Amino acid sequence: MTLVPAIGRELSNPPSDGISNLRFSNNSDHLLVSSWDKSVRLYDANGDLMRGEFKHGGAVLDCCFHDDSSGFSVCADTKVRRIDFNAGKEDVLGTHEKPVRCVEYSYAAGQVITGSWDKTIKCWDPRGASGTERTQIGTYMQPERVNSLSLVGNRLVVATAGRHVNIYDLRNMSQPEQRRESSLKYQTRCVRCYPNGTGYALSSVEGRVSMEFFDLSEAAQAKKYAFKCHRKSEDGRDIVYPVNAIAFHPIYGTFASGGCDGFVNIWDGNNKKRLYQYSKYPTSIAALSFSRDGGLLAVASSYTFEEGDKPHEPDAIFVRSVNEIEVKPKPKVYPNPPV
């Protein structure tokens, strides 16, 4: 019997440069991975098998699935691509004016949504033929460069540089439903919507995560809070690490955070508790994704150049089996009432 290390099984054939994102399919244990080595790769995470690879004209900054064997990728070469691993075929949906940082596919709207450093969000209809004039639905100006996107149902959350957060309804993109400022004082690294659709978690470069709610009523806003994480004390000094990644568990609504300290923590946001911390990974955590049933967690251990160019551990993808005890909220224990 092969003993699986505590940090999970390492996949063979990893990218040769920084990993920008990884995502599990909604239908299987297929894993889509984008990288600065200009590649998008499709793995079978269970069988440790690379099923296919596309090479693009620049660093690939994000990717997402459409169905089990096709998806979308966005690139520093400004292009938005549709990629089909079964057919071995790619085509360009369109372009931005600057590198494209993030991509999401909305199953609710049947649209691809991209965010770029050109300070725009664009929506595309992937069913159209190739060519911008046939596939582009709309362009929406943002206050700053787009750093992170997240979708839940018809809601789109856009986090930009300058700590801006815009919240849209995909059915009416003419203007944001809400314009907000991040509750955190420093640059946003990642935004992810709660699976139940009530709000979003947002992480910053300064070792913090904030828990936010869409409902603007006083009662709902009273529930929002922020907490410190991915820090350590050394010689009386607090060393603070960027929190690069957030991933919600699809069943329990708890979430994982990954930081430049090489740690992955599991949190129960409702009860404001850390449930688990995994053993340290070789380098920074660049991205995280739970499988569709929450039974696997994919971890990109990949230096994110937060300390500039320096020797670092090789970029690697680990797939870890998730034990229910690590992710299931613990029931609140109430003291027995006096007799």
UniProtKB/Swiss-Prot annotation:
It comes from Arabidopsis thaliana. Expressed in actively dividing tissues such as roots, flower buds, flowers and siliques. This is Mitotic checkpoint protein BUB3.2. It is found in: Nucleus; Chromosome, Centromere, Kinetochore; Cytoplasm, Cytoskeleton, Phragmoplast; Cytoplasm, Cytoskeleton, Spindle. Part of the mitotic checkpoint complex (MCC). Has a dual function in spindle-assembly checkpoint signaling and in promoting the establishment of correct kinetochore-microtubule (K-MT) attachments. Promotes the formation of stable end-on bipolar attachments. Necessary for kinetochore localization of BUB1. The BUB1/BUB3 complex plays a role in the inhibition of anaphase-promoting complex or cyclosome (APC/C) when spindle-assembly checkpoint is activated and inhibits the ubiquitin ligase activity of APC/C by phosphorylating its activator CDC20. One of its GO terms (biological process) is chromosome segregation. Keywords: Cell cycle, Cell division, Centromere, Chromosome, Chromosome partition, Cytoplasm, Cytoskeleton, Kinetochore, Meiosis, Mitosis, Nucleus, Repeat, WD repeat. Belongs to the WD repeat BUB3 family.
